[in-house]
Amino acid sequence: MKTKILKEKQEVINKLQVGDVHDYPLNKWFPKNSWSTERKIKFTLKKIEKYYDAELAEADAIENAEEVREFAISVEWANSRMWGANPNATIRVGYDEFISGSISGSGYDKESTAIAGAFNQSEKLRGILYKNRGKIADKYGWYDCDCSLSGGVGSECFWRIFESCGYEVKHVASGKTYDAWIVSKK
């Protein structure tokens, strides 16, 4: 994961050192015609360093995350006049709580989007995917792992991924406006 980030960082820096600052996304922050190309490059290099340092710190936290024995997922549904039922997922890992916020719209699986949104906030949980990336890749073709879940694919897909990582998923409660699962190490 770190090597991929470092490689991407080096590619961006190499492109920038050639003097190609006009296609760089940060060029919208440059004052019009008042900065020299050297100053633009220096400014952009600082921004690149800051961005990739944060990416590397996150990757390091994911790689060194402690093992999660159990976590709870709950999804509450709220009615919306425009979008029908909107889910809001909460994942609890020990004393930590991660909340997705309300997911609206139509044409995709909102429940899995809410669960993925809450899951991806935790380095501990993303560490599960990182440490078991070989098992996941063999089963689901997930070779270039960014160690996060994608929403809109159906929550059943997540349960199968967790099971392939050595976890057991139990649906412990459901009702008209809520669902709850416990995911624990086998």
Region annotations inferred by a language model:
Residues 20-47, 51-61, 81-178:
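Acidic, low-complexity, intrinsically disordered interaction modules
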Residues 70, 180:
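A residue-level signal for beta-strand positions that form part of recognition/binding surfaces
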Residues 62-67:
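Acidic, proline-/serine-/threonine-rich low-complexity intrinsically disordered repeat tracts
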Residues 71-75:
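A short beta-strand micro-motif
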Residues 1-13:
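Short, charge/polar-rich alpha-helical segments
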Residues 183-186:
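Active-site beta-strand termini and strand-to-loop segments that position acidic
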Residues 78:
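Short, cationic low-complexity segments
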